Amino acid sequence: MHHELQTLADPGAVARAGAAFVAEHARAAVAASGSFHFAVSGGHTPWAMFAELASQAVPWEATVIYQVDERVAPPGDPDRNLTHLTKALGPAPAQVRPMPVNDSDLVAAAASYAALLPEYFDLVHLVLAPTGTPPRLYRAIRSCRSPIAWSLSPSRTRGGCG
């Protein structure tokens, strides 16, 4: 696999390049297997990319988007990552698999969500925040020697996988 480091002029250029990258991988995955399984991170960083992605030539009818991070808040709440994801994508007809963070039994909800996940994702989008996330992520990747297990975060204010 070829890796390339790009330096882009501004956040808008990053959003456009990210959207083009996702769209290209979506088309390739659908051509190869008939579907595109895309895991997306939370936070505000990817919102502009998702807005750009909505206008790209993406095979939306074959695209399934999975959340890997969510806050426990009512549907439509501005603290919810899902609120911003669906707003940014607009009318794009992708199938979005929201995390069931408002269920009364979050352990059962996490197990239910895990059952929906594909064995492999075609693409995983992660946000590396300036708050120290990159070093933790890199340590986790280096130490990962077995398949990732999906789990509920111990915090009742955020859901996630790890």
Give the residues covered by each predicted segment.
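Short active-site-proximal "capping" loops at secondary-structure junctions
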Residues: 44-46, 71-72
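Local beta-strand N-terminus motif with an aromatic residue
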Residues: 62-63, 121
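Short helix-capping segments at alpha-helix termini
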Residues: 56-61, 91-92
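Histidine-anchored nucleotide/phosphate-binding helix
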Residues: 49-57
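Conserved phosphate- and dinucleotide-binding cores of soluble alpha/beta proteins
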Residues: 9, 13-14, 73-162
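Short internal beta-strands
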Residues: 64-69
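N-terminal glycine-/serine-/threonine-rich phosphate-binding loop
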Residues: 1-38
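Glycine-rich beta-strand-to-loop/alpha-helix junction loops that act as flexible
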Residues: 40-45, 126-130
